[in-house]
């Protein structure tokens, strides 16, 4: 298939990645002459030189420049951002879809690096490391007894492909320290978490972000499901803050017919660039459902909007974030970068889904809180839409612009999470910590159990629910969970499944009673 080469990766992250939303990137270098017209830069340069040469105390002019750049960009829009060198490397790595490391999922548990699960067939698994092992030393570097931030830990464990590192670990089951030599290798950072069957002839694919490898991962998952005879597909974009625009476009192309419009952009000078679908999509006729929520942004909204506006997909969930700006990146010699908004993107019917930002960045991000206060997350009729931003699809369906994708089928937040207490538990990650500690205390209780046997074991007793209630009390949380016992039990079981069997099994458990998935399946009856 051919993708419009004018669209480069959107590296977004709607408040999920770096505490800011990084927007759609277009592939066009910013030439020095484009900046020549900005005569004010002379004033800035003179000021920096004056401070550097004459200020009474020693001062780091680099930090002043960074603050200046930050301040300038913050006055433009919420998505024009400065990215310092350390964060730029992290973003690039995440969106690349892989890195070189030892292949473990871990927690900083109390004062040590605790392995949740080695990556299957990864370097650590091959070397013999196991779930529950504590990494004490990486070479001669001590990794326990202090709180190292995750990025510092990663830097100790990463390296050149093929390089070897000796790890000293404490294995609780044997009550002794062990040494392992681990050869670093390329570790995939999956953007497609799961592809599985969720009903008769219905497949499900979860995309957590749009990275360089997303389209390839998606095609692999879709092909696997098609071999199982799917007639309908659910694409889960909940909490997907975006990613590479061209990857979202490529996914959309699999569902649309030749020459159907996917997305278009408009720049300051009025230039319009359109991207159309090509013939030969692998799922042009089956039913498609897209799950979204208030954290689905940018590239996710491009995909959802393309399918909704072409009457090709049914959107299920809650109004999406509302991120419709396109950025161009300018790199600096120190490894930092600026992403500047240079265009807006529009869905096929011509709507911009960018929410207003004229009142400043603080009000812009506060809008998410306003949705809770207005009741929008609980009732469809609380969604504010303007008649002036009303559009029609080819089949006459009314869709709205001005702030996110409005779903065709609304699913309130309490249908998913029961109440605010449960939603809070999921945000804190406390369920994962509880499960890790339970397994750490008695991993043998699950030893040798096949997955179906595990499910029977978890359903036969409410032991872990009661233990969890005590656990959260000990952490200082006084949350009433009795009314949502079944829901909390499902999350506990799903987390046990993840840590014991892997990510796919988490979804196998959690999707069985998922409110949005159930809404889709009820439509098909």
What are these regions (language model features)?
Residues 352-353, 357-525:
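Conserved functional hotspot residues or short segments at active or partner-binding sites
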Residues 9-25:
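Hydrophobic membrane-insertion alpha-helices, especially the h-region
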Residues 28-40, 44, 48, 52, ...:
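Cleft-lining beta-strand/loop regions that shape enzyme active-site pockets
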Residues 138-139, 170, 341, 356, ...:
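Residue-level recognition of conserved beta-strand edge/terminus positions
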Residues 78-114:
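PDZ/PDZ-like peptide-tail recognition elements
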Residues 299, 311, 318, 322-389:
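Polar, glycine-rich mid-to-C-terminal structural blocks
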Residues 59-88:
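N-terminal, post-signal-peptide region of Sec/Tat-exported proteins
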Residues 132-134:
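Structural motif
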